């Protein structure tokens, strides 16, 4: 896969390679201006390249645009917010 082309559909951001999803992050509305990041998947051959962080940042960008707060249900998303203090303002309290 030469170029990361992050695509979107309702509830997810994803990367496809030859028509197959090789990386995806899913989120769902929780009501009252809150979304949860539910799951992150990166195919084994793409792990360790920062793709999961890119996908979390896509959800963060979406949350900022839509004025939403985030609940990081997915353990990877929780880890991301642990590392990136500046984005914690988006966490639902």
Spans of features found by a protein language model:
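Conserved acetyl-CoA-binding loop-helix of GNAT-fold acetyltransferases
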Residues: 48-61
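C-terminal structural segments of small proteins and small subunits
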Residues: 58, 62-93
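A short, internal acetyl-CoA/4′-phosphopantetheine-binding micro-motif in the GNAT/acyltransferase core
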Residues: 40-47
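Conserved N-terminal entry element of GNAT/NAT acetyltransferase domains
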Residues: 1-8
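A generic "binding-loop/recognition-motif" signal
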Residues: 11, 42, 76-77
């Amino acid at each position: 896969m030469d170029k990361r082309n992050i695509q979107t559909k309702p509830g997810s951001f994803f990367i496809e390679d030859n028509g197959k999803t090789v990386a995806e992050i899913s989120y769902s509305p929780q009501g009252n201006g809150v979304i949860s990041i539910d799951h992150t998947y990166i195919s084994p051959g793409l792990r360790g390249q920062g793709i999961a962080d890119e996908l979390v940042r896509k959800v963060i960008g979406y949350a900022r645009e839509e004025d939403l707060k985030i609940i990081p249900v997915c353990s990877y998303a929780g880890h991301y917010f642990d590392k990136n203090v500046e984005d914690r303002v988006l966490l639902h309290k």
